[in-house]
Amino acid sequence: MIISLRFRFLVVLLVVFLTDQAFTAFVFEDTDDPVLWMCMQLLTASMIGLSALYLRYFSRPMRTWYFVMLACLAALALESRIGWDTWMVYPHVFNKLLVIMPLFAVYGFYRRYGMPPLGLLMAFLLVGLAASLVINFPEALSLASFVDNERGFNVESTYLILLLALYYFNQYVAKGGLPRLLVFFVALGMIGFLQHRTVWLCAVLALTLNILLLRRTAGVTLSFQRFLPMFVLPIVVALGGGIGVVLNNPEVVARLETSLEDIQNPDKQGTGSWRLQQFRSYEPFILEHPVAGMRLKGFELPIQFYATDSKLKVWKDGTGHHFHSWYVDRLFYFGVVGVLLVLVMPIRLVIRRLRHPEPLDANSAAFLAFLGSSLLYSFSYDWPYYMYSVYGFALAIMDPLPVAAPAAYQPRVPRRVRRTEEAIPSTAVAHADA
């Protein structure tokens, strides 16, 4: 009996996913716990070492990108040394570049070892997220929280549920199995119930991209037998689970209508208007430093965002500016260069892969659709720590190392013949030829 040990290759990606609050909540009640912060720094340092260890497995574009990132870190350290007489005056700003390093570590590791058993990883995430909801955030599952718009489960953890939904949907389309389809619908239902409207929009975009990618995915069966349960199962679950009764609740309907209105009017109501006010507070500084941003001086800038009711600063000075948009965060600290530094190479590599005639596999399609949705997610939130590793993993599995050609067949020469040939001097062979 042969036991596969490929599950050990999940460790790198699994450790990164464990940094999400849904999992850290089992150990740390406070997200600002200094021990948790130290663990995150140690993980980042380990990822830097891992990226250097597997550098030889990088493709040429990825290797170039890696050295550009190191050059940017060196330039930032030099700026700190010249202006503040220390090599790392504000770690908060340096971390915005260091957090990208897990992308290279995960890319190099999985380009070296190939696709791990993703089914085991996704099952772990599924059980872990469900357990965290029930144990650590039970208030998020109550109907009262839904009506009052109390989001117990944070947006980063909810966004991770979308990756699960994409994976199990593609597995169902490729291999069938009603349990996979059921997990997909339950995941979508939880995304809707947890009320993070940004994730709602990301789910619509990701599913659209995923369906387009499935058209050129190998092993996918787009048949009537596959699609029929997609329409029947939600109806059965809705009737059997009492969802129709819940939707008849006027408070629930009012909450859904309010959420849809917030999506339709992001500049006038809801958290969208709050983000717009934050952006306008910093817009002059972004426009004043459009190319490379304010960098270290940006951290010294006092908080510019004030609450509309109390006219007080939303956060304390010296704690960062807490941007609720990845784009605004990058533009403020590093300008247009900061945005392009992260996005240009992945977009280029994805486009090059999609232009290649070789079909995708179901896993690659799911991860690429998830990456596409991150471009929309970035308008509303900063990237979670695991997002960079997801980028690295997706780039690795869609561009694996080329398989070496098998060695040419050499017929086996009998030992007696070899001894005879070795016994004949080369000079004798030459005289014989003459």
Question: Across the structure, where does each feature detected by a protein language model lie?
Answer:
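Hydrophobic transmembrane alpha-helices and their immediate junctions
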Residues: 7, 332-375, 407-409
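A membrane-periplasm/extracellular boundary helix in multi-pass inner-membrane enzymes
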Residues: 193, 211-265, 288, 432-433
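Alpha-helical transmembrane segments of multi-pass inner-membrane proteins
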Residues: 102, 112-142, 151-216
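Long extracytoplasmic/lumenal interhelical loops at the membrane interface
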Residues: 265-288, 292-334
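Membrane-embedded alpha-helical segments of multi-pass membrane proteins
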Residues: 34-52, 93-105, 154-165, 201-208, ...
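Aromatic-anchored transmembrane helix interface
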Residues: 36-45, 61-80, 84-109, 120-129, ...
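Transmembrane alpha-helices of multi-pass inner-membrane enzymes
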Residues: 166, 345-346, 366-422
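Transmembrane signal-anchor hairpin modules in multi-pass inner-membrane enzymes, especially those
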Residues: 1-77, 111-115, 170-178, 224-225, ...
